[in-house]
Amino acid sequence: MDKSESTSAGRNRRRRPRRGSRSASSSSDANFRVLSQQLSRLNKTLAAGRPTINHPTFVGSERCKPGYTFTSITLKPPKIDRGSYYGKRLLLPDSVTEYDKKLVSRIQIRVNPLPKFDSTVWVTVRKVPASSDLSVAAISAMFADGASPVLVHQYAASGVQANNKLLYDLSAMRADIGDMRKYAVLVYSKDDALETDELVLHVDVEHQRIPTSGVLPV
């Protein structure tokens, strides 16, 4: 064997482990990509049902119907004594109520517990007669009659309870924006007093699209 053949054979011997190393590395990279894709799909699946503190609250839950948008309002209940009630009518901004004949399809309520939340609350939305003063007795009767769904939200060690949303469908009622003043959000504090720094309610009213201004405010 001459010198050139000896040198070539030596190179071939040195290359073999490198080829094996590349093969093992490629296999490892492929496995990592598959695992990453599986984790990504799992995270998307979990996120679909996971409550979020992002506002507006249709994000991460229900999509608006075609041709519809929504208006959000935020309610912060006052202190509610143990076993007592609170009610607040839905008051939309004037820029929305001027289109009072636009249909409303759904109302969504999301309960956002603040860090000090350690209570159990019941939340619902009801059509309330204009003559009602939303007294404790009146609200108590509305919770008891079973005429609308009720969301029960209670303290969880994680700080967030999975079922923090209530969706109220008004499609069959042909309700419009002008009717919203007839609806109220009702809260019952079951186990102890609900303090003012424990809870925030986000209410989304899904309605037909309305014209928006193209001029900046003065």
From Swiss-Prot:
Keywords: Acetylation, Capsid protein, Ribonucleoprotein, RNA-binding, T=3 icosahedral capsid protein, Viral nucleoprotein, Virion. InterPro entries: Cucumovirus_coat, Cucumovirus_coat_Asu_sf. The modification N-acetylmethionine is found at M1. Residues 11-21 have a biased composition (Basic residues). Residues 1-10 have a biased composition (Low complexity). It is found in: Virion. It comes from the Viruses. Residues 1-30 are annotated as: Disordered. One of its GO terms (molecular function) is RNA binding. One of its GO terms (cellular component) is T=3 icosahedral viral capsid. The N-terminal arginine-rich stretch does not seem to be the major RNA-binding region that allows formation of an infectious ribonucleoprotein complex. Capsid protein. Probably binds RNA and plays a role in packaging. Belongs to the cucumovirus capsid protein family. This is Capsid protein. The lineage of its organism: Viruses, Riboviria, Orthornavirae, Kitrinoviricota, Alsuviricetes.
